[in-house]
Amino acid sequence: MKLGVFTPVFGTLKLDEVLVKVRRLEHVQALELGTGGWPGSDHIDLSALLDKKPCVAEYRQKIADAGLSISALSCHSNPLHPDAATARAADDVFRKSVRLAEQLEVPVVVTFSGCPGDSEGATRPNWVTAPWPPEFLDILDWQWEKKAIPYWQDAAQFAGDHGVKVALEAHPGFIVYNVDSALRLRKAVGPNLGVNFDPSHLFWQGVDVPAAIRALGDAIFHFHAKDVAIDPHNVAVNGVIDTKTYRRMAERSWLFRSVGWGHDELEWKRIVSALRLSGYDYVMSIEHEDALASVDEGLQAAVDMLSRVILTEPPVQAWWT
């Protein structure tokens, strides 16, 4: 297992500057690159690289010369959006990201499952969170059977044809937001579709993260190291479903934090142990979205914590059995 960094945090920097900065972060060995959608594409240009072998080779070499690898290409967006143009744009960046991942020899593309509307005439997504009134269940059935499953059957097949795995980040607001929904879609689509496991979206739902990791097992294709802090006072008053903007930090029930600032070192040791028990031995990619810390301070805090808990060497053979 090794540490990586998700690059949107360096959106104001050029790639060469990013490489210099990351090389100074001891223990970090990989980059997760945004290729479009919500992460943006500040450090890799799909159109400039795709199907241009010399450019692809030069880009790969630049990353390698910095002592780094690329863990994933990430294009988080909503390919199920009821607005056709929005959905087409999301699908286009996903497919281009898959093709470029193949050419860069990157094994996985990360995105969201997306969320449809409630009918063919919808213009905005509709995330259903309750089984009652009963029409909500009708909406859910339609979303899954008519939109999510058909789209991802085709998209995962496309990725598989290019030797690339699809890792969906379980995120509230989308069809896949927890273990149950992730496994439901994987069962319908096939083993080339799995999960980008981000504990920050599960902690505040009340999920025991190590238990969720064990439940997903080999469906975990990539991992985001990001923490969340629960505000006990605000939760006591309003619960955990919170639509306040992230700028209203003091009023929110939870906030994204640097690793270690939401959950302690023991909890992250439990997470690393669960990943190893589940067979995951790839990258823990640090995603910095802590509005209370600077980029440098927040990233360093995450690296310091994770470098103490990550297991980088193969496990011992149990001679005591």
Residue spans of the language-model regions?
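Histidine-acidic metal/acid-base catalytic patches
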Residues: 1-30, 57, 64-66, 84, ...
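Active-site acidic/histidine proton-transfer and metal-coordination neighborhood
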Residues: 17, 58, 62-65, 79-194, ...
